[in-house]
Amino acid sequence: EALIYVGFGTEKVESTVAHIFGDAVVKRMDADSMTRKEAYRDTLRAFRSGKIDILVGTQMIAKGLHFPNVTLVGIINADLALHLPDFRAGERTFQLLTQVAGRAGRGETPGEVFVQSYTPFSPSIQFARHHDFTGYVEQELEFRERCDFPPFKHAVLITIHSAHQERGKFSAETLRRKLREALPEEFMVAEVAPAPLEKLQGQFRFHILLRGGAIMRLSRLIRETLDKLPMPEDVAVAVDVDPYQLL
């Protein structure tokens, strides 16, 4: 009884919008509603022709679609991805906002974009708001250089998987210690941390993030350390050089 449910998905948004705009034809576009290939194509065709008035969807409606008759776009929880523990979170948020906002006003009629955010003064949101690509790139590169993130330094993400949480954590901490002993001080070796998606498909996941400039040397030293450190049968290790995401 003390629990309060918050948040919403596309289905809840669809029903709420349909209730508020009773005369409008509302359609939802997400992975659950677009199980057939034809459903995706038919929905886009109906929306483009004006048979659908309001389209509610996930990121799948953000990219590469041209709707000349769209004059209003609303983005709910625009900063959701911004708070993920990933150095590219800001970049992805800026990219998504720019893409979604670009759906409005593509015809002769000017468009408007409404953005819902808990952190409206975030650089990603403010630069997207002002369509300032150059400004965003400059501040993002300054941040990356200050923190030794790509493209100024290389990053290597090591993920340790195990069905047994304690065994996986112990193996990760042992590997981290061996890496720190083997690598020169010029390479940064972060402490072991649970992955943001800590358990996936029955496997507990732990991360070790490394950063350095000489990627060939770093990769070789990681490989040599792993070769000298046998892992339990139920522990797997994955190495991702310059990972696209840290989840």
Q: For each predicted feature, which ranges?
A:
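Flexible catalytic loop/linker elements that gate and position reactive groups at enzyme active sites
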Residues: 172
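Charge-rich, low-aromatic oligomerization/scaffolding segments with amphipathic character
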Residues: 219-220
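Short proline/glycine- and acidic-rich turn/helix-capping motifs at secondary-structure junctions
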Residues: 191-201, 237-247
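Conserved short beta-strand edge segments in small beta-sheet-based binding/regulatory domains
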Residues: 185-189, 228-242
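Inter-lobe coupling/hinge segments of SF2-like helicase ATPases
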Residues: 1-169, 177, 181, 185, ...
